[in-house]
Amino acid sequence: SAWRVLLQPGAASPEHTLTSDEAFVALRGSAHVELEGEAHELTAGDCLVVAPRLRFSIRNDGREPFEAVCCMAAGGQAVVEGEGTFVPPWAA
């Protein structure tokens, strides 16, 4: 499945893991990514692939929206510690 993500300034995801690979291709803006506790910046033109079971979060610390195209296998799940597993609507 493929979808667009739009993170407004100040928006963030909770730390989570995935059951399958998830790929992000940044289209505009920038985002701060934490991957297994390591900080990365994702800017327009960058690609990031998050492997299964890696702790991951993304946030927009900038002044402009961050937009990306994401891909994940249909049926892939996200796991938030203490909250359980769910299938993101775009991966259903």
Cite the ranges covered by each PLM segment.
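Glycine- and acidic-residue-biased ligand/ion/polar-headgroup-sensing regions
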Residues: T19-A31, E36
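Short beta-strand His + acidic residue motifs that chelate non-heme Fe in jelly-roll/DSBH
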Residues: P14-E15, V33-E34, V50, F56-R63
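Conserved beta-strand segments that form the floor/walls of ligand-binding pockets within enzyme
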Residues: L6, V25, E34, V49, ...
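A short glycine-rich, His/Asp/Glu-containing loop-to-beta-strand
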Residues: S1-E15, S20, A73
